Amino acid sequence: MDVLVINGPNLNLLGTRQPQFYGHKTLADINNDLLKIAKENNINIDFYQSNHEGQIIDKIQQTAAKIIIINPAAFTHTSVAIRDAFLAINKPFIEIHLSNIYNREEFRTKSFLSDIAYGCIFGFGPNGYTLALIEAINYINMKGE
């Protein structure tokens, strides 16, 4: 596998949950958009969503992906364990958020992942996933993997 896309808690509710922040696209819509781009670029992509921190950590530890795109959602601001999982596997990842976490409540402005991420994309709604995938493809091509 080339790219793993991980979505954290409550992202299974996209399309209906706080559309003023997250838009009207569902997670399935976003995944379908990414799948089309991946196919056009001969990239193998897999998708995973969980509301449970430990399951996300297990997925990070077990993946054979060359690069990970993650929207950790609320775990962004709380999970030292997810941070430690990324440090343990030593693989590049791109942190993504639909909303700009720096334009939200104060507690949402701290990310436990940003400083160790290959890159971060915040505030572009569902298009942020597309931007992340394009950069993941660029990374794979740059590394010649």
Swiss-Prot record:
It catalyses: 3-dehydroquinate = 3-dehydroshikimate + H2O. One of its GO terms (molecular function) is 3-dehydroquinate dehydratase activity. Pathway: Metabolic intermediate biosynthesis; chorismate biosynthesis; chorismate from D-erythrose 4-phosphate and phosphoenolpyruvate: step 3/7. Substrate binds at N71, H77, D84, L98, S99, R108. The record marks R17 as: Transition state stabilizer. GO terms for biological process: amino acid biosynthetic process; aromatic amino acid family biosynthetic process; chorismate biosynthetic process; quinate catabolic process. The active site is at Y22, H97. Pfam families: DHquinase_II (PF01220). Its EC number is 4.2.1.10. Keywords: Amino-acid biosynthesis, Aromatic amino acid biosynthesis, Lyase. Gene3D superfamilies: Dehydroquinase, class II. InterPro entries: DHquinase_II, DHquinase_II_CS, DHquinase_II_sf. Homododecamer. Belongs to the type-II 3-dehydroquinase family. HAMAP family: AroQ. Catalyzes a trans-dehydration via an enolate intermediate. NCBIfam families: aroQ, PRK05395.1-1, PRK05395.1-2, PRK05395.1-3, PRK05395.1-4. This is 3-dehydroquinate dehydratase. It comes from Francisella tularensis subsp. holarctica (strain LVS). The gene is aroQ.
